[in-house]
Amino acid sequence: MINSLLTRVFGSRNERQLRQLTRLVTQINALEPTIEKLSDAELQAKTPEFKQRLAAGESLDKILPEAFAVCREASRRVLGMRHYDVQLIGGMVLHLGKIAEMRTGEGKTLVATLPVYLNALQGEGVHVVTVNDYLARRDAAQMGKLYNWLGLSVGVVYPGMPHSDKREAYGSDITYGTNNEFGFDYLRDNMALSRADRYQRTLHYAIVDEVDSILIDEARTPLIISGPADESPELYIRVNRIVPQLTKQESEEGEGDFWVDEKGKQVHLSEAGMGHAEELLLQAGILENAEDGLYAAQNLSVVHHLNAALRAHAIYQRDVDYIVRDGEVVIVDEFTGRTLSGRRWSDGLHQAVEAKEGVPVQRENQTLASITFQNLFRMYKKLSGMTGTADTEAYEFQSIYGLEVVVIPTNRPTVRKDHPDQVFLNRKGKFNAVLADIEDCAKRGQPVLVGTTSIETSEMLSEHLRKAGVKHEVLNAKQHEREATIVANAGQPGAVTIATNMAGRGTDIVLGGSLESEYHALGEDATEDARFKIKTDWQRRHDAVKAAGGLHIIGTERHESRRIDNQLRGRAGRQGDPGSSRFYLSLEDNLMRIFASDWVQKAMRMMGMKEDDVIEDRLVSRQIEKAQRKVEAHNFDIRKNLLDFDDVNNDQRKVIYAQRDELLDAESVKDNVDGIRGDVIYDLVARFVPPNSVDEQWDVKGLEATLESELGVTLSLTDMVRTQEEIDAEQIAAKVQAAVDAHFAEKEAAVGNDTMRALEKHVMLTVLDQGWKEHLAKMDYLRQGIYLRGYAQKQPKQEYKKEAFELFSEMLENVKREVIHLLARVRIRSEEEVAELEEQERLHAQARLMASQFQHQDVGGYGTDEEAAQVQSGNAPLPVSQVTRDEPKVGRNDPCPCGSGKKYKHCHGQLS
């Protein structure tokens, strides 16, 4: 009550912020007459002037009004577009590091030019993040004209571009790219072995377009760079043959082998199912011993493969969750309907789906580097974003990213009419109504956009429309390449476009069709008459569509998130245009079936509803919204939980990547190596000669043997211990340290300082990367089983933090030991020695080849028909020549001349 009274008196926080920013808009507008009078050269000279003022200590906020006024005037001259006042407010919100919620068609791309220009003046780089490569290249090309005119450089990054081009793009004042590309390049940079191999500068400022899609919808999917693991994929194929023989239960208590938890996207074997699965696996020879049981320790890998196969068959559907293209399983984004080429599900799920579809099963991958979008974007010094739908997720943006959402008013009032939902008993009745609505719109010349939640539904609707003779376009993952063309024509009179979810998001649907696309098709050499004719035709179509009611949106199912539904609705009614929307639902829809209250379904059946009967009731709409809120809260908990765990990994990642940066930047890592060597020697001696112990507890011979095997240092300590009466552990440690230091000094003297420094750096980076890779695998295993600790009355998150710290400490110790072992055992040769060894190897290879020829002939001599063998081979016997040795014979126990350090008999002298 009090809050509502205060809001009425003082306005909401959003209104108060808008009032403050409106004062700045007044200042910018006051500067406009002065800025308009500047010549092109004078306007362009403002950029270096602003840079000088910033260098002199002036703040960005101080020059904001003038910089925004300059950018607005430059945009008017170069692009023919002048920023509205509400767009200036949007630009200020982005500059302040907040999220600007702006309705579809309000010109978010143009809004971004204001804060991008202002922040690029600092020269530290601005990243503009888009949801796909098409939008990144389009926006970089269109807005790049403005930035270049103002004296700023623009780059765009995309997969597969040459290394030098990508470095140049990241070195630009402004860089466009997708969230995936920025993330993967960050990981690649932290796997590079030299500064020259890195792309990115410090993460300074990012503006994320469609920020809700990237920071919320994709937050559950970590970016992973991986390499193939050693395990064969054969077991996935064998287990895949078992799963179709198991039967699905209708409920957890029903009869069958397994039941599906659709909320959690998991499959669980029943008691009977475990026994049946064991029996089938034994028959297939996958389980070896019937007495051990499916859940014995040695069969855990089989359980992992079986769970993956069950999920692949029972939960993941073709043309809904993935498509099969060119013999590969390609994931379909559940939020946008776009294909995610190059991405793979983890935990063996992708391999299980490949086995199910009968395409080649690729090896499981081992993680080399990974990061979540949550932790990637939180590393930017300043982060902001823009979208048409953020207010429903304002709490999550604030709590996880520290980003406040500011709702920007529209330039013109929205006149779209949102009709109430229509609820049917089953899918058949629902789709009959959808088809009737589409046909009605097509007859009246009203364009209609139909949003579906799967490729399967879009193709089913397409088939019905084809039979009814209704011309239409389908926009889903299978028509990804034609996306821009289809969206450009979606506003034509009577056009029918079926789209999966938000495919085509980022491109406006203009009533009457895209005038820009028609101009582009004419070419630059088109006459004024031709352009005038096109403009006249477009205006006629535009007016006809407005008269028919504008763009009509049909939703065939409610999404789990209200935000996705709002995005679909937001495609209509842009810039004050007319439009309408309606959602058609059925009790068989996933949201209604899984999350809506049972009483809704019972009530509709008790009322004797038939297939084509419809309900339009606020009570039902409230229940649907309640179900959506439940799912949103559930998904938020999942993302928050993921972040809690990844924060542990992130702290460790920061330590490792900071260490790598130090190594890459250092001219020499000798001091690091010396320090590590001291630690390793101390630990090594302490294993055999514990501190503060008596000599009866010492294992001196063990220490000598370990020094020889691990460090290549021969040192006699036994005599010293026997002959010296008063000797302690510290003296032994000092003796060992001196011997190892001398061993390293000897190596350095032999090869020179420069070579040794380069080797030390290379070994430290390589061992650190290998250790981190193995540590990530251990962390994955720890994460997968950590929830079992809950059964022991322990907090899984606390246990994870504790054990992750122990694993990390262990990894760092292992890295230290491995660095010293490698540097101690490595043998570096001069160029002359390498050339000599290569010549020796050539001679040895030639001798082995001749020996094998002689052996073959000798063996042939013992055959029953030597002449027949010669006729079949087509060769006469080779003359046996005397082989003379230029060098002393290499004994089988001598070191191999190749320099491997192995005995000759275990290297190039192995018996075949």
Curated annotation (Swiss-Prot):
- SUPFAM superfamilies per the UniProt record, alphabetical: Helical scaffold and wing domains of SecA, P-loop containing nucleoside triphosphate hydrolases, Pre-protein crosslinking domain of SecA
Give me the stretches of Basic residues compositional bias.
902-912
Q: What is its EC number?
A: 7.4.2.8
User: How and how many cofactors are bound, per the record note?
Assistant: May bind 1 zinc ion per subunit.
Query: Which parts of the sequence bind ATP?
Result: Q87, G105, E106, G107, K108, T109, D508
The reactions it catalyses are: ATP + H2O + cellular proteinSide 1 = ADP + phosphate + cellular proteinSide 2
Q: Which GO BP annotation is one of this protein's?
A: protein targeting
Q: Which Gene3D superfamilies match?
A: Helical scaffold and wing domains of SecA, P-loop containing nucleotide triphosphate hydrolases, SecA, preprotein cross-linking domain
Q: Membrane-crossing residues? A: none
Q: What does this protein do?
A: Part of the Sec protein translocase complex. Interacts with the SecYEG preprotein conducting channel. Has a central role in coupling the hydrolysis of ATP to the transfer of proteins into and across the cell membrane, serving both as a receptor for the preprotein-SecB complex and as an ATP-driven molecular motor driving the stepwise translocation of polypeptide chains across the membrane.
Give the matching HAMAP family. Answer: SecA
Q: What is this protein called?
A: Protein translocase subunit SecA
